[in-house]
UniProtKB/Swiss-Prot annotation:
Family according to the record: Belongs to the radical SAM superfamily. Biotin synthase family.
Annotated binding of [2Fe-2S] cluster, by residue: C109, C141, C201, R271
Organism of derivation: Bacillus velezensis (strain DSM 23117 / BGSC 10A6 / LMG 26770 / FZB42) (Bacillus amyloliquefaciens subsp. plantarum)
Binding site for [4Fe-4S] cluster: C65, C69, C72
Protein name in the entry: Biotin synthase
NCBIfam families assigned: bioB
Catalysed transformations (reactions): (4R,5S)-dethiobiotin + (sulfur carrier)-SH + 2 reduced [2Fe-2S]-[ferredoxin] + 2 S-adenosyl-L-methionine = (sulfur carrier)-H + biotin + 2 5'-deoxyadenosine + 2 L-methionine + 2 oxidized [2Fe-2S]-[ferredoxin]
Length: 339
């Protein structure tokens, strides 16, 4: 048994990955990459088999954000030429939900730019979510920014299953990325969502000049937060943002990062998110030996690959898409457990 499979077995037996072991994963010799990914898949298979969860983003409100996040094309300091608009009408949200349902995508993610939602924007999302649930039964994830407890309660009661608010980077690196809100603001929103009964979703953006130790700290912070779903983004540096020109990550390093997140958060949904196509490139399929979830279609202000290419990739891998009906059954089981 090689060192990575030995570590995987210990993780499955309940052991936690030490900092030294985590650094070893990120520093894994390239010639041992397939051994590492095989061990990551050994963990993934225990909890998810060969299933892959599909997610689709609806950019419900674009631009117009007062925050100064250095990676974001929608921020107040960005000069990127993006489309800006206020919260879209309900029929647009319903149209997106129908498309997700028709493509057998189980999770529909409603994302709005800004520091946090106004009560009117929460009203709009609540109104749409009720109809989406009744008509299509999709799993709904909302990502609306910093959240107040009463807003979280309303979203939960309307049928929002999951709330996303990423920590983005390590606490140590946070002030290098933004100064308009704190790391604790982000953590508190995840906790607020969790306290309302929504499933907490929080992830990271790798490639923002952080160290390997920062990446390890991110994975451990999400373990401490007990995030059910962890989107791992790889920076897609956009012209007009402060991080424009930052070099793309090497695909092999991206795979090691995904393996690290699987080892540290063995039972969680690990989703390969923004920047998948430009950073992993031809090695995208290997990422799913560690991750068990992807976004299908476009991201917020950058294009993803065609849905047909994603489905072909999954078919070629021999993986199975979690259908909308399977997702519904899982939600019902979770509801019964809560009762």
């Amino acid at each position: 048994m090689n060192q990575w499979m030995d570590l995987a077995e210990r993780v499955l037996d309940g052991a936690e990955v030490t900092n030294q072991e985590a650094l070893a994963i990120l520093n894994c010799p390239d010639e041992d990459l397939l051994l590492l990914m095989h061990a990551a898949f050994h963990i993934r298979k225990r909890f998810y088999g060969k299933k892959v969860k599909l997610n689709m983003i609806m950019n419900a409100k674009s631009g117009l954000c007062p925050e100064n996040c250095g990676y974001c094309s929608q921020s107040s300091i960005s000069k990127a030429p993006i489309e800006s608009y206020r919260m879209v009408d309900k029929h647009i949200l319903l149209k997106g939900a129908k498309r997700a349902h028709d493509l057998n995508i189980g999770t529909y993610c409603i994302v709005a730019s800004g520091r946090g939602p106004s009560n009117r924007e929460v009203d709009q999302v609540v109104d749409a979510v009720k109809e989406i649930k009744e008509t299509y039964g999709l799993k709904i994830c909302a990502c609306l920014g910093l959240l107040k407890p009463e807003q979280a309660e309303r979203l939960k009661q309307a049928g929002v299953d999951r709330y996303n608010h990423n920590i983005n980077t390590s606490q140590r690196n946070h002030s290098n990325i933004t100064t308009s809100h704190t790391y604790d603001d982000r953590v508190n929103t995840v906790e607020t969502a969790k306290q309302s009964g929504m499933s907490p979703c929080s992830g990271v953006i790798v490639g923002m000049k952080e160290t390997k130790q920062d990446v390890i700290d991110m994975a451990n912070s999400l373990k401490a937060l007990d995030a059910d779903s962890i989107p791992v983004n790889f920076l897609h540096a956009i012209d007009g943002t402060p991080l424009e020109g930052v070099s793309e990550l090497h695909p092999v390093y991206c795979l090691k990062v995904l393996a690290l997140f699987r080892f540290i958060n063995p039972s969680k949904e690990i989703r390969i998110s923004g920047g998948r196509e430009v950073n992993l490139r031809s090695l995208q399929p290997l990422g799913l030996y560690a991750a068990n979830s992807i976004f299908v279609g476009d991201y917020l202000t950058t294009a993803g690959q065609q849905e047909t290419e994603d489905h072909q990739m999954l078919h070629d891998l021999g993986f199975e898409v979690e259908s909308v009906e399977e997702m519904k059954a899982g939600l019902q089981s979770a509801c019964n457990t809560e009762v």
